Every structure is written in structure tokens, then in C-alpha cells.
């Protein structure tokens, strides 16, 4: 038995195709996560995983369960969807659930970046305003590269300039322009600063 809990992100941020798992189950689940064709695997500390989630409950009962998250809430991204579908067929093939047709021989999957919580930087709004991104999508970034600005909407002045604190990869990017103090703007994998 195996469970894959598939989510889009919320309506506020865009997520690179990723698999999330609890560090308590990482040794057992990481090999499965690598089969899912995700760009990113994020291993959370036990403290950040809610006891009431499907993944927590099933893993606690011994059913291997992963959470796949991608895109933006209430939207379908064809490229991300196809990427995950390929990963699901690869996982099913490796679990002996599905046999790859001989003509295809093998499903090519990406080697994901594996991250722990200590390697993720959360960039948040210091003031309320309008977030205007400087980058179009998630991906590689260098320390000091612009991620975006928060604009004061009445006067149009920049009240916060957001730069990457590390060389790494942006795997979460603000999608909804309206931000309040403390709102998540981006997550960057690449180590703590």
C-alpha cells in the first residue's frame, strides 16, 4: 500500500513541483520521493507537521505517504501536471503496480534537490503593500539577485527591495500581489544566512 496526497499550493504563492515529507519518516520515504519526478524534495522537522493531516496519520499507521505540492491554488499547470504524472507512473512501475510498455522501456525522471528545513530561507514582507516580482518563475538564483519589490500603492514608492540572501533556487514565489506585513514572498533553498 502507498498513498500520494496531491496538492496545488494556495492562491498566494506558486510552488515548484515538490515532495514534502517529515524527517521522522525521511529514511523510509526518501527513495519513493526521488521516483516522483519532482524538482525539489523538502524534508520538514517533526514540529512543523500537523498531527491532523492525512500524511501524518497514514505514516503513523505504517502506510507510506508522501505529499506532492505544485503550482498555484485553483489553477492547473499542464507542464507541472505532466511532470508529476510521469513520476507517478515511474513510482507505480518501481512498486510493481504498473508495467512500463516495452516501447517506452523506462520513464526518465529528474534528480530532485533534497533539502532540509535548515537550508531554506523564508523571505517575508516587512511592510504591507503591492508585491511586484523581478523574476518570472521559480528557479536558480544568485546571492544579491532581485526577487521583487513591495510598492506603497498610493505613492508608488518602493518600501522594500527583496534580494536573494544566498546562491540557490527559488522554489516558492509570491503570486498574489497584495501583501501584508509578515506575508511569505519567497522561499529560497541554499543554506541559512
Q: Can you annotate each of these PLM segments?
A:
Residues 1-193:
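Structured catalytic-domain cores with a bias toward divalent-metal coordination
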